[in-house]
Amino acid sequence: MKIFFAVLVILVLFSMLIWTAYGAPYPVNCKTDRDCVMCGLGISCKNGYCQSCTR
């Protein structure tokens, strides 16, 4: 059971790392540039979506 939990934690950490490096796997809606802070610094809101998070 400990091995299963350890593998699960590793998978979660890697998925968070990939999300951080490549943006969110889904389009992030926004109204202002402040809504895009989770996508990284300096990311702008264009056409209602954070540009870096919609690759």
UniProtKB/Swiss-Prot annotation:
GO terms for cellular component: extracellular region. It comes from the Eukaryota. It is found in: Secreted. Expressed by the venom gland. Keywords: Disulfide bond, Secreted, Signal. InterPro entries: Scorpion_toxin-like_sf. Disulfide bonds join C30-C45, C36-C50, C39-C53. Negative results: does not show any effect on Na(+), Ca(2+) currents, nor on voltage-gated and calcium-activated potassium channels. This is Neurotoxin BmKX-A1-S31. SUPFAM superfamilies: Scorpion toxin-like. Residues 1-23 form the signal peptide. The keyword Coiled coil does not apply. The keyword Lyase does not apply.
